[in-house]
């Protein structure tokens, strides 16, 4: 979600990004990243494979999430040229029609989706796509918020615990310097509360505490403007913790 408090950090115009709220669902265990790879002489090959079950599993998750949001899913593929994408689109259409008739399913080619993401990001609610396309589109989407350090993620299975982490890498060049933005990590904890522990109110408390801290003009270096107070990683995290503990629900979390 792009909030007004950080809209100035985005390279896009405020009227384009304010209020943008997109949930990306990326398939993580299949596709070209996990296909057969070989190199012989001057020829290299990467094989992209998807099964109906793999596609149906991630589509069901996207549709369940859409039911909790605005009820719309955009399935992104390259069905005009790729056989795996044609399978993806067929399965997406069937799962939505047979199992989630209350969810509006739309299809988009990945190149058009990448363009629309910058021109009119409010057009999207839940975006679901295969592994490589999701890898690219989520990094592109980080530009909307102004910093990749703001964004959380969850790796979810149909059953069992999830894995929660910010979408950025380890950034070893920032280690020990107090420059990293902790928002992605803190908001990932909120996702854990909501999706693995079923604690929606507590998750909302964490999220609103992050946004309240940003509204006060406290920023880490990646977001700070001329009128903002630049905080270290530890100072920003402490300010969020104070917001959480200042709330009755927050004290219960602590």
Per-region residue spans from a language model:
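Accessory "access/gating" subregions that flank catalytic or transport cores
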Residues: 88-89, 96-149, 244, 248
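Short coil/turn connectors at secondary-structure junctions
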Residues: 12, 18-22, 29, 68-71, ...
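Short glycine/threonine-rich loop-to-helix capping motif typified by GTGT followed
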Residues: 82-93, 118-124, 142, 216-224, ...
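Short glycine-rich or small-residue beta-strand-to-loop segments that form or flank ligand, phosphate
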Residues: 72-79, 188-194, 224
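Glycine-rich phosphate/diphosphate-binding loop of Rossmann-like nucleotide-binding domains
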Residues: 41-111, 123
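Internal helix-turn-beta structural module
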Residues: 175, 196-254
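Glycine-rich phosphate/nucleotide-binding loop
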Residues: 1-2, 118-218
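N-terminal glycine-rich phosphate/adenylate-binding segment common to multiple enzyme folds
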Residues: 1-45, 132
């Amino acid at each position: 979600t792009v909030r007004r408090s950080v809209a100035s950090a985005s390279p896009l115009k405020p009227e384009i990004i304010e209020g943008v709220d997109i949930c990306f669902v990326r398939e993580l265990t299949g596709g070209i990243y996990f296909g057969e790879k070989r190199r012989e002489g001057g020829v290299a090959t990467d094989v992209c494979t998807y099964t109906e079950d793999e596609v149906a599993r991630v589509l069901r998750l996207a549709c369940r999430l859409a039911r909790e949001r605005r009820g719309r899913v955009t399935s992104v593929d390259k069905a005009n040229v790729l056989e795996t994408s044609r399978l993806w689109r067929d399965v997406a259409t069937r799962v939505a029609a047979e199992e989630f008739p209350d969810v509006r399913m739309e299809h988009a080619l990945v190149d058009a989706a990448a363009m629309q993401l910058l021109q009119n990001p409010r057009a999207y609610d839940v975006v679901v796509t295969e592994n490589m396309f999701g890898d690219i589109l989520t990094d592109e989407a980080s530009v909307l918020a102004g910093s990749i350090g703001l964004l959380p993620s969850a790796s979810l299975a149909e059953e069992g615990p999830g894995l929660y982490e910010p979408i950025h890498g380890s950034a070893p060049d920032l280690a020990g310097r107090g420059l990293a933005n902790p928002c992605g990590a803190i908001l990932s904890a909120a996702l854990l509360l909501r999706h693995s522990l079923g604690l929606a109110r507590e998750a909302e408390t964490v999220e609103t505490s992050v946004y309240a801290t940003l509204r006060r003009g406290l920023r880490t270096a990646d977001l700070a403007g001329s009128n903002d107070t630049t905080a270290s990683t530890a100072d920003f995290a402490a300010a969020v913790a104070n917001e959480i503990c200042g709330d009755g629900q927050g004290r219960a979390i602590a």
